[in-house]
Amino acid sequence: MKNISILGATGSIGSQTLDVIRKSNGELKLIGVTANTSVKKVIEIIEEFKPSYVGMMDAVSTHEIKKYCEEHNKKIKVLEGIEGLDKIASLDEIDMVVTSVVGMIGLEPTMKAIEAKKDIALANKETLVVAGEIVMKAAKENNVKIFPVDSEHSAIFQCLRGNDINTLRKIILTASGGPFRGRTLESLEDIKVEDALKHPKWNMGRKISIDSATLMNKGLEVIEAHWLFNCDYDNIQVVVHPQSIVHSMVEYNDGSIVAQLGAQDMRLPIQYALLYENREKRIADTIDFYEISQLTFEKPDIDTFKALNLAFKAGKAGRLMPTILNGANEAAVELFLDRKIKFLQIADIIERCMEVFKTQANKELTLENIIELDKEVKEYVIKNAVL
């Protein structure tokens, strides 16, 4: 049995992780969960999975969960805020942490988990985007395994199994193209929030859905792949694959290409990360190749979707430039979801921040500098946002 903590248990990835645990026939046990403020969902988790630890992000929801546990005689340790995240990520009782919180808040608990020598099922992109060098070094020093939960990185991870990574020539990251694939820049001027949230293939949270619409999600995945697989940016290629059946590919020095195919179901990469090397259980539908009419591949339109190109530039610049990229994107996406800026302004804001903060990008790469600059960039975006 493997004991698990989930950071962000009520979100899209967290909920699907719970389903993997539910269907694991006792191979996985939930020990700790954290959530933002979703009291009702956490109570449902408590009743079904009986975790020993629960963390909520604010005082009100923490009080409500404590009150519920007292009234129903639940012997659960209820924790609050970032301290609760850190504690639940590094419990003595657990073997692995699923980091499915969204945004920069995932960085600190991920580092705490690594320091406590807990393996990581990583669904929080921002951790590697802003601090990949620090995180991967710490993981190596603490003999911690990092299992990617993103479908693309899980695919690459699987394609590399049994092969010498030194013979890797190129990583080919596939992208669905998002809901606006094939659209012109002019046609995206007045995109509504509701339209941007309608991903054609995947069921995802709000922030990642907007990132997919701008192609920033793929840009963040490029930086993530660079750190996970120690691959130069010039050897990472993004290919638009609208059917989302080929989840990613790797090309070796001999010219052969290995691809991973599967259903559009995030439970597949989650299960692979949690039950590594155990492929006995089928949790998702299989592909019927007689039903697939075609698999197509296209070049991404980086003129219309410039966020992808900005991510490549930030990754190549290194140091703190990915922090600027990520912070500006997080703040801009939030403003768009709140209907305070237009869709195309997201990438414009990111580009402007990369220019405004470029001198600070060369500071030493430390967790303190990352957190400080992230805050500064977000404050700048909020202060200067104009619809």
From Swiss-Prot:
It comes from the Bacteria. The keyword Ion transport does not apply. GO terms for biological process: isopentenyl diphosphate biosynthetic process, methylerythritol 4-phosphate pathway involved in terpenoid biosynthetic process. NADPH binds at residues 10-13, 124, 126, 205. Pathway: Isoprenoid biosynthesis; isopentenyl diphosphate biosynthesis via DXP pathway; isopentenyl diphosphate from 1-deoxy-D-xylulose 5-phosphate: step 1/6. Its cofactor is Mg(2+); Mn(2+). 1-deoxy-D-xylulose 5-phosphate binds at residues 125, 151-152, 176, 199, 212, 217-218, 221. It catalyses: 2-C-methyl-D-erythritol 4-phosphate + NADP(+) = 1-deoxy-D-xylulose 5-phosphate + NADPH + H(+). Keywords: Isoprene biosynthesis, Manganese, Metal-binding, NADP, Oxidoreductase. Its EC number is 1.1.1.267. Mn(2+) binds at residues 150, 152, 221. InterPro entries: DXP_reductoisomerase, DXP_reductoisomerase_C, DXP_reductoisomerase_N, DXPR_C, DXPR_C_sf, NAD(P)-bd_dom_sf. One of its GO terms (molecular function) is NADPH binding. The keyword Oxidoreductase applies. Catalyzes the NADPH-dependent rearrangement and reduction of 1-deoxy-D-xylulose-5-phosphate (DXP) to 2-C-methyl-D-erythritol 4-phosphate (MEP). NCBIfam families: Dxr, PRK12464.1. Belongs to the DXR family. This is 1-deoxy-D-xylulose 5-phosphate reductoisomerase. It comes from Clostridium beijerinckii (strain ATCC 51743 / NCIMB 8052). The gene is dxr.
